[in-house]
């Protein structure tokens, strides 16, 4: 499916970025931690070398290159582990499983920053406004929730905040094979975004509380 992924994640952003350049409109493009290979145990900066592990990461990296090549005022925002009250995501999956399970095995050696979709949207607007007014340089930035955590740790917080009594057993990635390889290290260094635009990392635990309230799943 890499050809389809490339159309969606590279060709479409290229067309949008070119249109924005022609109209002198700032363009904010959302990318992913999957452009990295997940090696090491430190946070990756926007300037670190990329090495995607699979088709998704390659298509997103191609999209980044296309947006930059359009030559306009742009910001590429790499983020990770996105969750919200809408669509399919880890939070909603955990809540669904908690309805029928009292214990779960969750990967504990993948580390990253869960990021509320609402905070990503607000950040995109702030960046676009800054670029429109001539403040803030174009380029690649990272934006992810804090503090960094494993999927297992994320699950425990979901169950704690929602009042679900579900035991979480840590397992390694190799015990939970997936069709697409996932990075072990999804930590993103977000200091350049805060320096350029004054936007700090969001506390994902606060974002989780808002999502659970929106879903009607918060602990009473």
Role assignments for model-derived ranges:
Residues 123-124, 130-179:
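Mid/C-terminal beta-alpha module of Rossmann-like enzyme folds, strongest
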Residues 65-112, 118-119, 125-126:
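NAD(P)-dependent short-chain dehydrogenase/reductase
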């Amino acid at each position: 499916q890499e050809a389809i992924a490339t159309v969606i994640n590279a060709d479409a952003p290229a067309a949008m970025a070119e249109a924005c350049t022609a109209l002198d409109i700032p363009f904010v493009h959302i990318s992913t931690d999957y452009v990295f290979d997940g090696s090491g145990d430190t946070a990756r900066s926007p300037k670190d070398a990329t090495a995607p592990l699979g088709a998704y990461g390659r298509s997103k990296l191609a999209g980044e290159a296309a947006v930059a090549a359009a030559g306009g005022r742009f910001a590429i925002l790499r983020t990770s582990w996105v969750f919200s009250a809408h669509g399919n995501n880890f939070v909603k999956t955990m809540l669904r499983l908690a309805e029928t399970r009292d214990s779960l095995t969750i990967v504990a050696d993948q580390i990253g920053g869960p990021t509320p979709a609402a905070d990503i949207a607000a950040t995109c607007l702030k960046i676009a406004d800054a670029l429109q007014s001539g403040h803030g340089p174009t380029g690649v930035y990272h934006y992810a929730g804090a503090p960094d955590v494993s999927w297992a740790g994320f699950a425990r917080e979901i169950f704690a905040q929602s009042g679900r009594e579900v035991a979480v057993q840590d397992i390694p990635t190799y015990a939970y094979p997936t069709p697409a390889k996932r990075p072990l290290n999804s930590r993103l260094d977000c200091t350049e975004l805060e320096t350029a635009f004054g936007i700090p990392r969001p506390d994902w635990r606060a974002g989780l509380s808002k999502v659970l309230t929106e879903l009607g799943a918060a602990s009473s």
